[in-house]
């Protein structure tokens, strides 16, 4: 998905604000550790509405190759998304896969180029196309598949004077503990905190992403965020001191995904 574009400002803006609550200092950060890098390749497409059914068929056709890569361990997850909040300059669809190495990501991409699926008629009909490559060190998921889930993505941009470890601090202090609880409850199937691995935009941005298994999960996560903020309303002040709120954007997409 284009994990850098917009919807509903309330969303995980609240989660980002809550992320600085760190109560007490170091109590939660000592429990959350960085994981090995997880790389995600996202291919975004703006497809004319008349070709949306063909795009769904193209996603189905690609599934066999992705499932084979998942089974072999080349990748650890894959999926496709349909954008639910349309913008004049945005994508309508995307396809993505994740691996614990750049080689895993690139090997799958090479397979698609070799098979000719990247030049299919429906992709040729796209009015816009762009790719993104992200890396995460804070993430988790449940093994299995999700059909017609909801992925919520929030983009934030750090201020120039923000500390070098700001994203790590946000992640360890609340984002991971909060979303781990939602994962354990089955409210979400996956989450990650992403930064660009290949910078197609200026450095300093990060994403908070979670996949709700159903629409009710969006409300449950939002409720958990609101409770976290109530526990320390000053958290938003600290978060605002390190992020440029004018650059904040959200995205909501319908997701089919599988994880190893």
Q: Residue ranges of each PLM-predicted region?
A:
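N-terminal secretory signal peptides that target proteins for export/translocation
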Residues: 1-7
């Amino acid at each position: 998905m284009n994990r850098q574009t917009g919807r509903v400002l309330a969303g995980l803006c609240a989660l980002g604000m809550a992320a600085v609550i760190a109560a007490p200092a170091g109590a939660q950060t000592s429990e959350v550790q960085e994981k090995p890098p997880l790389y995600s390749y996202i291919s975004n497409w703006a497809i004319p509405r008349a070709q949306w059914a063909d795009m769904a068929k193209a996603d189905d056709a690609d599934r066999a190759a992705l499932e084979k890569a998942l089974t072999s361990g080349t990748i650890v997850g894959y999926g496709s998304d349909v954008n639910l909040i349309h913008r004049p300059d945005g994508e309508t669809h995307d396809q993505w896969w994740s691996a614990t190495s750049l080689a895993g990501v690139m090997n799958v991409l090479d397979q698609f180029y070799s098979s000719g699926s990247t030049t299919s008629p429906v992709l040729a009909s796209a009015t816009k196309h762009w790719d993104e490559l992200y890396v995460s060190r804070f993430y988790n998921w449940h093994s299995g598949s999700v059909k017609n889930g909801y992925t919520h993505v929030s983009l934030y941009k750090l201020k120039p004077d923000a500390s070098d470890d700001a994203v790590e601090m946000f992640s360890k202090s609340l984002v991971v503990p909060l979303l781990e609880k939602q994962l354990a409850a089955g409210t979400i199937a996956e989450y990650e905190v992403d930064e660009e691995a290949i910078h197609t935009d200026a450095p300093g941005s990060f994403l908070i992403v979670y996949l709700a298994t159903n629409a009710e999960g969006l409300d449950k996560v939002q409720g958990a965020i609101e409770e976290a903020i109530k526990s320390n309303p000053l958290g938003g002040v600290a978060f605002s001191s390190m992020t440029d709120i004018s650059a904040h954007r959200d995205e909501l997409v319908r997701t089919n995904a599988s994880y190893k």
